[in-house]
Amino acid sequence: MTRVAVPLLIVLGVAIGLSTHTVVNCGDEDEPDICSAVIGFSPFRGSLIAFAYEGRGRIALRHGNNNRAIADFNEAIHLNPNRASLYRDRAQAYRQNGDLGLAIADFDEAIALDPKPALPYHERGLALAAKGDLDRAILSYSTAVRLAPTNAQARLDRGLAFLARGQADDARADFEAAIALPPGKDARTRDAARAKLAELAHAEPTQVSTPRR
């Protein structure tokens, strides 16, 4: 789509009453020019234009342009500070940039605004584990597991955190639970859990009886 056509599309959308749909969904496709045209179109203001920044930020995040994504999410949060998904999206960009403290703070904010979804707890657990805070990571994973008990990846990641703490029995229980969940689109997760179980079995010391004196 040409840069001339994009603004024309936005104007046409306004004319036929599709402006809100265009703004809210401009990030669904890899067309950042549409989001940029929405941002530059003066009738859009306030929380509505935040969707355009959010959409362009998500496009940048999908393509690994984390700094661009963070800049757009900053603008979106400034315009719509009570939208939990914006903090979660920015947290993902921070985490991928290695800014774990900022990522954890944003996951905390996303959870404070909307504590029901499991994913922010899971992703916060990943950031905490990467930072070495295994106790808090396990707590965060545990909430994710409670909210989404069929999420095999959350159980695998909690098992890995238990394993890193030397809690082999707890780790084994999570790996076994991940494998036992109903089949879905998580074959790689199950394979990883099986591999970890095999490692644990191989690492178990052979029980040798010592004769009593």
Q: Which functions belong to the PLM regions below?
A:
Residues 55, 89, 123, 157, ...:
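Canonical tetratricopeptide repeat
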Residues 54, 61, 88, 94-95, ...:
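Position-specific recognition of the canonical hydrophobic site in helix A of tetratricopeptide repeat
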Residues 46, 50, 84-85, 118-119, ...:
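Helix-start (N-cap) detector for alpha-helical repeat units in TPR-like alpha-solenoids
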